[in-house]
């Protein structure tokens, strides 16, 4: 993985090349074949991923109760992401060791990922507080943006549900 490519990811915004290299040294390259789920909803997470090449689909289980007493195992595609937008995912595992993945991630095409273990990322942030501050600020921006998007989606769903109930 190229250092200039890594610098394009929002998590490394405002970090210089030497600062990003500290993370690069701890990253593992992973190749995922087309069609493979490589994060499974409900599993315990211990790493974050950067999508270097390919396309992924993030899914969540609907898990609706059926009249027969069983579960509906269908999944809802939340978003498709391409490497050209430099996505990062799995970041919630940084903040809670027992945090379970809240979605599944599937490779739509063959993918190349950079995996960074949560413990390694946090150790770098502890050892180099200036770098840690920048990375955590960047993560906060990422999470805030996602929270705003989630709130907008909840409002849309609530509005649609209210309109259906009014009929």
Question: Where do the model's predicted regions map?
Answer:
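A small-molecule sensor/coupling module
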Residues: 101-102, 119-159
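Short, flexible helix/strand-to-coil boundary loops that buttress conserved ligand/catalytic motifs
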Residues: 60-62, 93, 117, 125-128
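Cyclic nucleotide-binding regulatory domains
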Residues: 37-108
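A short hydrophobic beta-strand segment most commonly corresponding to one strand
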Residues: 111-120
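Phosphate-/nucleic-acid-contacting segments
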Residues: 79, 153-167
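Cyclic nucleotide-binding regulatory module and flanking cytosolic helices
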Residues: 1-29, 33-34
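Hydrophobic residues at beta-strand termini and immediately following loops
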Residues: 30-32, 81, 116
